[in-house]
Amino acid sequence: MEEKQYTLSKAERLCSKKLIERLFAGGNKSFPAFPLRVVYMPLGIEDEGAEVSILVSVPKKRFKRAVKRNLVKRQVREAYRRNKYILLDALRQSENPKRMALAFIWLDSRLHSGDEVEHKMKKLLYHIAEEKLQ
């Protein structure tokens, strides 16, 4: 049995300005699970990087203080890191393997517990995995 990797490497973070622009340019799929929204886009095999690249965004409009924005980003990254196997397993089992770019956007103006964020993250990842298999 293969042991799961619970890490979030630099390669898994979406840093490319071109990819970020393509992700938010429109026509890509989006799904909310309050307090999160995910925007995702399939990438071709020719694109470099990890199987799934993520971006976490917490608007300054929602949290004025950087300390709180950083706390929320940390919670979202941690929830993804602990549950990314849901999406990775679905991508590996699909007949035409591809890469994906994901952006997690925080929608609420208040903090939530780590457990609640993780529950919503699972909901989002299962939704993307189901849609990917179809």
Range-by-range predicted roles:
Residues 1-134:
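Positively charged, solvent-exposed patches that mediate nucleic-acid binding
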